[in-house]
């Protein structure tokens, strides 16, 4: 007799894996859709031109398409091009591995800067003062200081005349066309939906693919009726707003927010490699190799610091919320419990997961802030090494009250053979009972990345994505439960929506998120394709000036 559940799972997995293959981007259907796309005409950009803020950091550094077009513009003016090339050389030096190559690059930069500004000088964007410093530099420290000054001057130069000329150029016109294209309405027709990957309190998470680019994402579908019945609207909106503010390679990105008839949808980074909890307990011997522990911990620390810099406390750090991508890099996910520090005011509301909550969260009416995340980080590093949490053994049955008392009173023990001295030390420091004694919180400049546990990690290269992960997930494996194991939600009855609800849904559905959307457009080749003046198109003449999308989405 055929097992229909197993058959359904096989079909769902096969379709999902097929969609994930890079070759799928070459499908005839995808190419047909892309031929039917065109950028909006310039005449439709007049209002946007008036509204858009001319902020250099946003336009030319943060937004990928703006950055790309600004770079292309600089290449058309010799003086501007030299400044841009110099900054690229500085970045390459900063990201180079320590050794003779990096030393040689530094000396080359100093020599480049040492020429005094004069007619015909190849570095007119640098001052005489910087040239003099470079000429006088004899030690490595002096050379680094001189190049740092030169970098600042080159950046300041680009923000003046080059930027002014850029925003009156055809390159900026093209940017406006892309911004208008970015602002098109988004609905469920924009995506192809694949298998369910999991579920949460208000709905399910499924894999989706953008029809026009082939890009795969995870879509968190929040049931509107369930949200209203459980009073979850505020939490959902807070998670969305926090995700919109965060742009970090170590935190899942929000790419789209839209509504369907029944759901509010958050479309985010698809992490195909599973979560760290799965890898700790379900792949080989419990626990992870130390090389993986160090690598993941370094990326987690970077993500945590990015949140803290934005005034956000994560409050739900645990291996289950750390997801791996196709290449083996990890990102923090599920920001549903994250909270913004309003004016630096501490928080008192209890939130988190048992076994990872810091003592100050567990104590009644005690305020807390960023240090709680470092405590949970200590719990997570311990778990990655030992295959158990610090205050509860693997599969041990412990009441919430007992676990609370252990967290408040017990000193952490290191009985697992895999603990190195560095791992023990960083766990002890993260698991300090008092937040003011905790690593990352002892003083303003207390940076966990400086701990000797991370001595093998070059953090600038890590942040630039230049370090190869120690483990790469198997691309032929679906790291998710069988669809039969994912519970269905019961129907929510007796919930009606009023005008206030409908307005909330409308406000929630803001469409594409600029940075993530622009990254998708460049990554999938659509940027080059739509910018090509010679490309064949399936649009009728004149359609592009009206909508920018000739094919119904």
From Swiss-Prot:
AGC-kinase C-terminal domain segment(s): 455-520
All copies of the Protein kinase domain together span 191-454
Q: How is it modified after translation?
A: Autophosphorylated in vitro at Ser-490. Phosphorylation at Ser-36 is regulated by light and activated by cAMP.
The UniProt-reported impact of residue 23 to A is: No effect on kinase activity. Increase kinase activity
Q: How is its activity regulated?
A: Inhibited by phosphorylation of Ser-36.
State its Enzyme Commission number(s): 2.7.11.14
Subcellular localization, as worded in the UniProt entry: Membrane
The free-text tissue note of the record is:
Retinal cones, outer and inner segments.
Q: Which residues form the RGS domain?
A: 56-176
Task: Indicate how the chain sits in the lipid bilayer.
Answer: Lipid-anchor
Another remark in the UniProt entry says: Although the protein is present in a diversity of vertebrates ranging from bony fish to mammals, the mouse and rat orthologous proteins do not exist.
The family assignment reads: Belongs to the protein kinase superfamily. AGC Ser/Thr protein kinase family. GPRK subfamily.
Specify the protein name: Rhodopsin kinase GRK7
Native organism is Homo sapiens
Gene name of the encoded protein = GRK7
């Amino acid at each position: 007799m055929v097992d229909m559940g197993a058959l359904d799972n096989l079909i769902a997995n096969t379709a999902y894996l097929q969609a994930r293959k890079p070759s799928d981007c070459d499908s005839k259907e995808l190419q047909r859709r892309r031929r039917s796309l065109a950028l909006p005409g310039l005449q439709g950009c007049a209002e946007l031109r008036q509204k858009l803020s001319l902020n250099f950091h946003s336009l030319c550094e943060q937004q990928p398409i703006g950055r790309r077009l600004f770079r292309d513009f600089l290449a058309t003016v010799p003086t501007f091009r030299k400044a841009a090339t110099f900054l690229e050389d500085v970045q390459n030096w900063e990201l180079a591995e320590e050794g003779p190559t990096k030393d040689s690059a530094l000396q080359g930069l100093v020599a480049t800067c040492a020429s005094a500004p004069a007619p015909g000088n190849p570095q007119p964007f640098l001052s005489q003062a910087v040239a003099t410093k470079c000429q006088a530099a004899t030690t490595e420290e002096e050379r680094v200081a001189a190049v740092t000054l030169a970098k600042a001057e080159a950046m300041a130069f680009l923000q003046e005349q080059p930027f002014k000329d850029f925003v009156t150029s055809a390159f900026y016109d093209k940017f406006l066309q892309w911004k208008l294209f970015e602002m098109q309405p988004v609905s469920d027709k924009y995506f192809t939906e694949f298998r369910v990957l999991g579920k949460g309190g208000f709905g399910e998470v499924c894999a989706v693919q953008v029809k026009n680019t082939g890009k795969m994402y995870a879509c968190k579908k929040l049931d509107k009726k369930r949200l209203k019945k459980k009073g979850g609207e505020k939490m959902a909106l807070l998670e969305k707003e926090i995700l919109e503010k965060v742009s970090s390679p170590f935190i899942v990105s929000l790419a789209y927010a839209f509504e369907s008839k029944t759901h509010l949808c958050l479309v985010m980074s698809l992490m195909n490699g599973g979560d760290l909890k799965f890898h700790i307990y379900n792949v080989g011997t419990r626990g992870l190799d130390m090389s993986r522990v160090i690598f993941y911990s370094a990326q987690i620390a970077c993500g945590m610091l990015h949140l803290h810099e934005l005034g956000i406390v994560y409050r739900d750090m645990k291996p289950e919320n750390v997801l791996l991508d196709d290449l083996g890099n990890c990102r923090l996910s599920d920001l549903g419990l994250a909270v913004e520090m309003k004016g630096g005011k501490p928080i008192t509301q209890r939130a988190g997961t048992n076994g990872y909550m810091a003592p100050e969260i567990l104590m009644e009416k005690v305020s807390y802030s960023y240090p709680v995340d470092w405590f949970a980080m200590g719990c997570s590093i311990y778990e990655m090494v030992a295959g158990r949490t610090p205050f509860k053994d693997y599969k041990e049955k412990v009441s919430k009250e007992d676990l609370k008392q252990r967290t408040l009173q017990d000193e952490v023990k290191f009985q697992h053979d895999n603990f190195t001295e560095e791992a023990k030390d960083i766990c002890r420091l993260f698991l300090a009972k008092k937040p003011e004694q905790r690593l990352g919180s002892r003083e303003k400049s207390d940076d966990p990345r400086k701990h000797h546990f991370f001595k093998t990690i070059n953090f600038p290269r890590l942040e630039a994505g230049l370090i190869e992960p120690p483990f790469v997930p198997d691309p032929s494996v679906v790291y998710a439960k069988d669809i039969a194991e994912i519970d269905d939600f019961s129907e929510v009855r007796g919930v009606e929506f009023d005008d206030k609800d409908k307005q909330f849904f409308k406000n929630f559905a803001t469409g594409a998120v600029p940075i993530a959307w622009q990254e998708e457009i460049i990554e999938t080749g659509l940027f080059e394709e739509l910018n090509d003046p010679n490309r064949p198109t399936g649009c009728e003449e004149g359609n592009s000036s009206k909508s920018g999308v000739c094919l119904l989405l």
